[in-house]
């Protein structure tokens, strides 16, 4: 009779499930379906209270992706436990500083989804000040670098690029715009953009140029020097920060992941939701 507690070893663990949801949420074409699914959004909320920090980290990345879709924000904000769980992550003393900042940004986006402009601005500034207080002296100012990556044309290349960027100490977050072969990277202010180019060049199949705007507002591609830059290795996963500075818009231009099909994604969401509904009791 007690079948719901049987053979958990045969099912995916929480980290693999949340990582799959994160990867699906990275594709703009999947974001509405994930939020509309009856099990996935509540599951991500429960993941925020998981005792394993990488699970919390991955859940927040997924939520940040989902919040990029404006049509999702009201439903996300109204989902039972969403705002409270984000507050708990921010206020918990054991939460890493950058994870607090990530949770605070998601909270800002959802909280301001139905505010007047003035109220939204004040609320977001207040939340950011609070997050920076939690970060303390370890919080350095971040900057955004937009890269055009020759060779970034399928999922396997994107995975290679992800692995290269994750190894760089000082990379806070990144998001891809596959349709235009771009990557928007948030980095510490003391990290040079050349380090990103060196890491991408190390893949041997991709090469990066920096996207900058001229005084007239036109975009230009600036090549990096071929001289390799020594890259300090990172031992921690970065957290996701917004790509507001991106000079391009991804909406209506995004491509689905290679080999993926809408019906396949729906089937996986159903499997994940089934796992979520039976497994979140710690």
From Swiss-Prot:
Phosphoserine modified-residue sites: 189, 246, 260, 267
Coarse class of the protein's main subcellular location: cytoplasm
Ranges of Basic and acidic residues composition bias in the record: 246-255
Region feature Disordered, mapped onto this chain: 239-261
Cellular component per GO, a single term: mitochondrial outer membrane
Any one GO MF annotation of this record: metal ion binding
Localization terms from the record: Cytoplasm; Mitochondrion; Mitochondrion outer membrane
Phosphothreonine PTM sites in chain numbering: 137
UniProt cross-references to SUPFAM superfamilies, sorted A to Z: ARM repeat, HMA, heavy metal-associated domain
Any Pfam family the entry gives: Arm
Transmembrane portions of the chain: none
Biological-process GO terms, alphabetical: intracellular distribution of mitochondria
Record's signal peptide: none
Residues in ARM repeats: 39-81
InterPro entries, sorted: ARM-like, ARM-type_fold, Armadillo, ARMC1, HMA_dom_sf
Keyword tags: Acetylation, Cytoplasm, Membrane, Mitochondrion, Mitochondrion outer membrane, Phosphoprotein
Post-translational modification N-acetylmethionine, affected residues: 1
Cytoplasm recorded as keyword: yes
Main function: In association with mitochondrial contact site and cristae organizing system (MICOS) complex components and mitochondrial outer membrane sorting assembly machinery (SAM) complex components may regulate mitochondrial dynamics playing a role in determining mitochondrial length, distribution and motility.
Oligomer status and interactors: Interacts with mitochondrial contact site and cristae organizing system (MICOS) complex components IMMT/MIC60 and MICOS10/MIC10. Interacts with mitochondrial outer membrane sorting assembly machinery (SAM) complex components SAMM50 and MTX1.
Annotated protein name in UniProt: Armadillo repeat-containing protein 1
């Amino acid at each position: 009779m007690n079948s719901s507690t049987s053979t958990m070893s045969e099912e995916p663990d929480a980290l693999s499930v949340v990582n799959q949801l994160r990867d699906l949420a990275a594709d703009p074409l999947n974001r509405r379906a994930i939020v509309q699914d009856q099990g996935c959004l509540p599951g991500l909320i429960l993941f925020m209270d998981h005792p394993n920090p990488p699970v919390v980290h991955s859940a927040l990345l997924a939520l940040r992706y989902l919040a990029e879709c404006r049509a999702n924000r009201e439903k996300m904000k109204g989902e039972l436990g969403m705002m409270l769980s984000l507050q708990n992550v921010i206020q918990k003393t054991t939460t890493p500083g950058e994870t607090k900042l990530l949770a605070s940004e998601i909270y800002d986006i959802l909280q301001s989804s139905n505010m007047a402009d003035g109220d939204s601005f004040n609320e977001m500034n207040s939340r950011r000040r609070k997050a920076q207080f939690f970060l303390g002296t370890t919080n350095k100012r971040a900057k955004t670098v937009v890269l055009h990556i020759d060779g970034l044309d399928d999922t396997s290349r994107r995975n290679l690029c992800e692995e290269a960027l994750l190894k760089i100490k000082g990379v806070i977050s990144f998001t891809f715009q596959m349709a235009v072969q771009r990557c928007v990277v948030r980095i510490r202010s003391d990290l040079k953009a050349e380090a990103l180019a060196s890491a991408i060049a190390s893949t041997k199949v991709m090469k990066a140029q920096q996207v900058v705007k001229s005084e007239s507002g036109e975009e230009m591609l600036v090549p990096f020097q071929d001289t390799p830059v020594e890259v300090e290795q990172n031992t921690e996963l970065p957290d996701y920060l917004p790509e507001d500075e991106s000079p391009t818009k991804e909406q209506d231009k995004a491509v689905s992941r290679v080999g993926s099909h809408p019906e396949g994604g729906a089937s996986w969401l159903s499997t994940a939701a089934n796992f979520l509904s039976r497994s979140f009791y710690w």
